[in-house]
């Protein structure tokens, strides 16, 4: 019985030391709502999408004049596809900017991870303003 208790304690100690060693327990949190509303790059990208979307809409309306049936459907599909590409490029640009900012802030502050603030009930270092400042 004594051997089992000692073996259990050794196993628990080994698991704890293995699981905790070399890992940074500090983590950051970022408020994504604040990032979306305050980051200049978000506003710039949204304006670009709106401008390109309006131009595409005007172009589509011109292309649709006099079209009926299958021709009209084909034009609509083409312009919908082009708008989806514009949106996808905008999302990729924002994601790249956010990822770069998060990595830089985490490295500067020595954080093991940065999590979305809404998903963390408590704790963490709030890095929202730092992330907003670094987004380009």
What are the language-model segments listed below?
Residues 15-19:
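C-terminal motif of bacterial Sec signal peptides marking the signal peptidase cleavage site
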Residues 21-136:
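Amphipathic, charged alpha-helical segments and their helix-to-coil junctions
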Residues 1-7:
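Bacterial N-terminal signal peptides that target proteins for export
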């Amino acid at each position: 019985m004594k051997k089992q208790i000692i073996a259990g304690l050794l196993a628990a100690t080994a698991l704890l030391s293995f699981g905790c060693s070399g890992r940074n327990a500090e983590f950051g949190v970022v408020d994504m709502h604040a990032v979306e509303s305050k980051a200049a790059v978000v506003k710039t990208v949204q304006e670009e999408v709106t401008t390109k979307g309006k131009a595409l809409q005007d172009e589509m309306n011109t292309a649709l004049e006099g079209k009926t049936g299958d021709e009209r459907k084909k034009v609509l599909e083409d312009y919908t596809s082009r708008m989806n590409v514009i949106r996808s490029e905008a999302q990729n640009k924002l994601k790249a900017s956010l990822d770069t900012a998060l990595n830089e802030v985490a490295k500067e502050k020595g954080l093991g991870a940065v999590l979305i603030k809404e998903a963390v009930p408590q704790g963490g270092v709030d890095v929202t303003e730092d992330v907003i400042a670094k987004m380009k």
